[in-house]
Amino acid sequence: MAYSYTEKKRIRKDFSKLPDVMDVPYLLAIQLDSYREFLQAGATKEQFRDVGLHAAFKSVFPIISYSGNAALEYVGYRLGEPAFDVKECVLRGVTFAVPLRVKVRLIIFDRESSNKAIKDIKEQEVYMGEIPLMTENGTFIINGTERVIVSQLHRSPGVFFDHDRGKTHSSGKLLYSARIIPYRGSWLDFEFDPKDCVFVRIDRRRKLPASVLLRALGYSTEEILNAFYATNVFHIKGETLNLELVPQRLRGEVASIDIKDGSGKVIVEQGRRITARHINQLEKAGVSQLEVPFDYLIGRTIAKAIVHPATGEIIAECNTELTLDLLAKVAKAQVVRIETLYTNDIDCGPFISDTLKIDNTSNQLEALVEIYRMMRPGEPPTKEAAETLFGNLFFSAERYDLSAVGRMKFNRRIGRTEIEGPGVLSKEDIIDVLKTLVDIRNGKGIVDDIDHLGNRRVRCVGEMAENQFRVGLVRVERAVKERLSMAESEGLMPQDLINAKPVAAAIKEFFGSSQLSQFMDQNNPLSEITHKRRVSALGPGGLTRERAGFEVRDVHPTHYGRVCPIETPEGPNIGLINSLATYARTNKYGFLESPYRVVKDSLVTDEIVFLSAIEEADHVIAQASATLNEKGQLVDELVAVRHLNEFTVKAPEDVTLMDVSPKQVVSVAASLIPFLEHDDANRALMGSNMQRQAVPTLRADKPLVGTGMERNVARDSGVCVVARRGGVIDSVDASRVVVRVADDEVETGEAGVDIYNLTKYTRSNQNTCINQRPLVSKGDVVARGDILADGPSTDMGELALGQNMRVAFMPWNGFNFEDSICLSERVVQEDRFTTIHIQELTCVARDTKLGPEEITADIPNVGEAALNKLDEAGIVYVGAEVQAGDILVGKVTPKGETQLTPEEKLLRAIFGEKASDVKDTSLRVPTGTKGTVIDVQVFTRDGVERDSRALSIEKMQLDQIRKDLNEEFRIVEGATFERLRAALVGAKAEGGPALKKGTEITDDYLDGLERGQWFKLRMADDALNEQLEKAQAYISDRRQLLDDKFEDKKRKLQQGDDLAPGVLKIVKVYLAIKRRIQPGDKMAGRHGNKGVVSVIMPVEDMPHDANGTPVDIVLNPLGVPSRMNVGQILETHLGLAAKGLGEKINRMLEEQRKVAELRKFLHEIYNEIGGREENLDELGDNEILALAKNLRGGVPMATPVFDGAKEREIKAMLKLADLPESGQMRLFDGRTGNQFERPTTVGYMYMLKLNHLVDDKMHARSTGSYSLVTQQPLGGKAQFGGQRFGEMEVWALEAYGAAYTLQEMLTVKSDDVNGRTKMYKNIVDGDHRMEAGMPESFNVLIKEIRSLGIDIELETE
């Protein structure tokens, strides 16, 4: 394999044994593909597929007026261009969206003509609001903030069969039910009650007998019985009664008479139970009629009405039980044939028959009325209303839709072969569902498992947006229908009919405030990627936290390779929010699929198939780690496999599929934990969650021990700058990279220049710092997909969330008790865990009732010192170092007129109006904050004059744009002239500036000319003349194009900003705050080993080894055994080896050894100790040297999950680095110099600093704001509140008998209003006495009691 630009510079030693059959797919595909399908941008009318927006329009249009004389048809839509790009949207606080224009056709029919002749057709494009666009990283910019729409895992539409697990009835009897769930529309439930009758519920309302629904569908009692039951036919001949025998039906019954064959031989004696052997004998004997006594009929149910043969009178209705009286009537009427229902207690219960018996309705109309009463209680039913209501419930495409998925699941579940069909239900569907339910109750078939991933599907962004859009369109439809009747008479255009507000509102509401539209977690690249790959069971149409039981939250066998069993939040959402597995994707129906390799006759092929949970059940699937021989055949006698969702072993020839990779089980975050296989699952869960909280450090440091996934995450997350096309680096500085594209990648007629502007010191959603640093130098050759610049938490294109620290596992004076962490001062000095946080502070000047607020440096009652960081416009300058209380933006607000004294009136009259009628409302730095101003943005309303600061910012931005465009033009021009030079040199000229005819053109001659004069050359070859003309035209076109581009950007910058009503001006100030690590900060490793920094010790006091190297961190060894996350110990050992090898390479470089020696040593590291071999021969000597230089800090290792380094390989690495194979060494106490008595585990562990910083939590209060009713201090840091002295704390003081302290706590330090003001005054006067009064909460209590009508008085003694 060829190495990319960055891989060459630092190759990771890979310990994996298994081959890469399949690359890790693009990690954001689930978001991007879904939304791309929804928009279908760029598709022509013919190319539109029936999904997304197009499908939503088609489902609502055409809209036909109530009279039917006018119709509005949908033709197609197109998306416009966004007004601002992504960065401008974030800056201005607007939504990144495009206008949607829909072409509709208004058709008016001729009223007079009988065959609806068309009278008039009008076509027009109608604006239907803005549709938010997805950025290339799968996020949306809504009102200037980056948001993610999380995918939802919901119950698939279709039919489900279930039982209540015996919980409903006290007897513990299983009550079975069936539920038809549509994509939209009413739910239909069938359920058994304890008496075994079947009931139906519509939309979970009160239940009706199921036969009511069947009657409403038009079935008669007889048809219903025929559909569900077979019949026994009895013939009456005089005094004998013969049964038409179906021997199978007798099984399990007790013979009430002797059963004989044709010859009179007794096959079954009276009183014996009939078995399968007896039935075989009966079938052999060919007995077709069986004589039975008349009382055999008693208690049986009639299947067909019994009619008097002579008179035609009905003797007994069908579904009536035969009694002695009835039999007498039948005998009297000389009926010759009776049909009864065949039922038994084992596999054919009388459920439907019993249900019909409790059903009070007798015909279709009564049934419809009954359903109408249930759906609309209290309304008087009419025949039409009842029919319409029932028809609309399940049989109208407007109100009911199973969707393609629902129809597929429905048909598969009830055993049909075809998977396509109508979206509405049919009579047959309902009958089939009932049949299946009755079969399950009879013991044939099983109930469904609703947690099976074949019954849960993923709804992605596109689908949810489409549903919202349809909701908006349906609202529009109602309004349009009413207006269409006017369209005929008033000659309206389509534009006048459609009001786009409801559509825009529905979309806005979905993206702005839906439960699944979330503020993006932007702590670091991993948290971004994980957020976009999250799958939630919550949200509209999903579960709620309170209702979700254990089963839903649990890991299911079908999660394998689809949903990660490890990564899920701790707390109330556990198991409801999951993460997609690394290789998982959704299929066209929205079910999750996992990839497998095909195995044929125990030979593993490279063919890959994606299977959903349903399709995989019948396969026998081997693990990715199954042993193969050289030919790729399974060799073990028994292979560990998964079959029918169980783990078992099978012979190799039975295996049909094999896993693609061992990491296909886990999610991206879990696959970044090295030695995951040695960690307990609970700790791995914490490890994968805490990696998402790591704050990007000042200097990213790649993990010495990684898993090989780091590069994929960094590349796919979009925080790095990735080359769009290959080429040569033309110029590079801190803020941009310019690439001159290689000739073979340049499309004709475009500039072969790619300019990448880097993001510098920008605030993320979590207030961390986003900053990109270029990796390339001028003249470097890069290919498409190479990484040009690192983003936050990335190091040379690899994810780098923390720092490699030298750790020792030993107790240290109790400073690392209970997971505390003891740090060395060196960590702070080297800024290893220093992070930059950027805060955005906003000052808004509004128009108030008393006049406009003003942003100015002229603030009343403020000293000169407070204003020295402001410019003349009253805004702080960039680069100022500010602390709590400093003014950032000066602002004054007019205050209401107060009654003036005569003296003040006089002063006013003399010195003019404006002296004292304003108050200071400046923006100040909040408490506990100290930092540097790094940027200021000023937004001014249209029509309000811009201040000097706004103008200078605008000028700066214009200069930057101009510089970019000039650079682009310079390169285009340069490239064009280079191509011309290649063509012209050596060719003969006809004439030109200072040139004779027939002279050959040389390089020197061209160098002497100005570039503009080249086009005055006349060449002998006409093709060259044509090339010169084309080049001249091309260059002038480019110039024009770039000028237009500049003017467009300039117009955007100079137009006023769209601010909220009543706002005149907004100033945003960005503060950069540097936070060093300090006691109280939370740190963690990647194995769920978290702790709080307890102390920072001087370097000289830390334990050190025999060479005098001190450790950076001392961790408590007791944190390992009980937590069972041994992975951290293995990581420490391998980290030690990696660092040792780096030091060895460093010594070789310092001793200036030959390249061949270096190459040999690198070969030993990469290719002689297990794992994947690296092809070092393809690197030249200079590249080997560059690689060695980058390895001096340590050789990075990759130990992929479930396929990582073995113990012997770690030992071999330690040996190669000349370190003890135990990974332990003797340490000395830094304070005394004495050796500790036992060897200590020392090595390198990757530590993260989490976003739980003590600076954000530290808080103290003396006096402050009080709650209105109780007059007690508020709580919490945000309210500048106090600490609550609660019930238990009061008990503690009571227990000590500290009466005065307790009184102080409950009165003057809490809610005794007079007491506390008096106390404050006393302290100011130096008198430290207190007088406790009445606590306000006692007064509240008395008022509460009085409000109950109890008079209560306080008596004073």
From Swiss-Prot:
Gene designation: rpoB
PANTHER family: DNA-DIRECTED RNA POLYMERASE I SUBUNIT 2
Gene3D superfamilies: 2.40.50.100, 2.40.50.150, 3.90.1100.10, 6.10.140.1670, DNA-directed RNA polymerase, beta subunit, external 1 domain, DNA-directed RNA polymerase, subunit 2, domain 6, RNA polymerase alpha subunit dimerisation domain, RNA polymerase Rpb2, domain 2
Protein name, as recorded: DNA-directed RNA polymerase subunit beta
Statement: the UniProt record of this protein carries the keyword Transferase: yes
Species, as recorded: Pseudomonas aeruginosa (strain ATCC 15692 / DSM 22644 / CIP 104116 / JCM 14847 / LMG 12228 / 1C / PRS 101 / PAO1)
Family: Belongs to the RNA polymerase beta chain family.
Stored Pfam families: RNA_pol_Rpb2_1 (PF04563), RNA_pol_Rpb2_2 (PF04561), RNA_pol_Rpb2_3 (PF04565), RNA_pol_Rpb2_45 (PF10385), RNA_pol_Rpb2_6 (PF00562), RNA_pol_Rpb2_7 (PF04560)
EC number: 2.7.7.6
Cellular component per GO, a single term: DNA-directed RNA polymerase complex
Keyword flag Nucleotidyltransferase: yes
Any one GO BP annotation for this protein: DNA-templated transcription
The protein's enzyme class: transferase
Reaction catalyzed: RNA(n) + a ribonucleoside 5'-triphosphate = RNA(n+1) + diphosphate
Record GO terms (molecular function): DNA binding; DNA-directed RNA polymerase activity; ribonucleoside binding
Keywords, ordered alphabetically: DNA-directed RNA polymerase, Nucleotidyltransferase, Transcription, Transferase
Function summary: DNA-dependent RNA polymerase catalyzes the transcription of DNA into RNA using the four ribonucleoside triphosphates as substrates.
Assembly and interaction partners: The RNAP catalytic core consists of 2 alpha, 1 beta, 1 beta' and 1 omega subunit. When a sigma factor is associated with the core the holoenzyme is formed, which can initiate transcription.
PROSITE patterns per record: RNA_POL_BETA (PS01166)
